[in-house]
Design a protein with these regions (language model features):
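Acyl-donor-binding surface of acyltransferase catalytic domains
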Residues: 1-46, 179-184
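A short beta-loop-alpha structural element at the N-terminal edge
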Residues: 39-62
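Conserved acetyl-CoA-binding loop-helix of GNAT-fold acetyltransferases
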Residues: 125, 131-144, 165-170
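Conserved active-site tyrosine of GNAT-family acetyltransferases
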Residues: 10-12, 168, 173
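A short, internal acetyl-CoA/4′-phosphopantetheine-binding micro-motif in the GNAT/acyltransferase core
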Residues: 2, 123-130, 157-158
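A conserved beta-strand-loop-helix scaffold within acyl/acetyltransferase catalytic domains
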Residues: 64-78, 84-118, 122-125
Length: 186
């Protein structure tokens, strides 16, 4: 629900829905400068196990982990399957990975929204390797290799995920909208 539509929010809350997340959508309308890193490449079928393992543990700020009625185990499994769906052709147009000593330490899953826009669907960096510029490098790689001229990258993240918001601001992303994410369990 768009964050400016409080009337709609209240309506759904009266139906038993509750807020689990406040989401910020951002966009980048310029190409990034290429950052050379020989460990960054497009994913290959053999990367699935490493990507799934990272996805299982990397996500803390999301609507599944925030929902008190969804167990931590289930929330982690959802993200693992979400990332794994790239390899079965069910979700994602591209996946960029960072490999170090034969281990996947980062991945970026992208979908095509329309002919001018790609969306960062998932992005994760192994906890031990955060703060080293790997997310920036993967986004740069995607910008150079997945975007045509005059195309846009969009991303959504949780307002509680201040690290991601700081990264996107540093890279030149601008806020385009915000919304509430609601769940209802029966």
């Amino acid at each position: 629900i768009p964050s400016g539509n409080i009337k709609k929010l209240v309506y759904f809350q009266k139906l038993g829905f509750y807020v689990v997340d406040s989401n910020i959508q951002l966009s980048l309308t310029k190409k990034m400068i290429e950052i050379k890193n020989t460990n960054v490449r497009f994913a290959e079928p053999g990367d699935e196990k490493g990507v799934r393992a990272l996805a299982r543990v990397a996500f803390k700020h999301n609507r599944f982990n925030s929902d008190p009625q969804i167990s931590k185990k289930v929330a982690c499994k959802i993200k693992e399957e979400w990332a794994g769906n790239y390899f079965s052709g069910k979700r994602g147009r591209w996946m960029v990975v960072v490999e170090y000593k034969k281990n996947i330490i980062g991945f970026l899953q992208l979908i095509r929204k329309n002919y001018k826009t790609i969306v960062i669907d998932l992005i994760a960096v192994d906890k031990k390797n955060r703060g080293k510029g790997l997310a920036k490098t993967m986004i740069s790689y995607a910008s150079i290799n997945c975007l045509g001229s005059h195309e846009v990258i969009e991303v959504g993240t949780q307002i509680a995920n201040t690290e991601s918001l700081a990264l996107y601001a540093k890279l030149g992303f601008s806020i385009i909208s915000s919304s509430y994410v609601l769940h209802r369990h029966q």
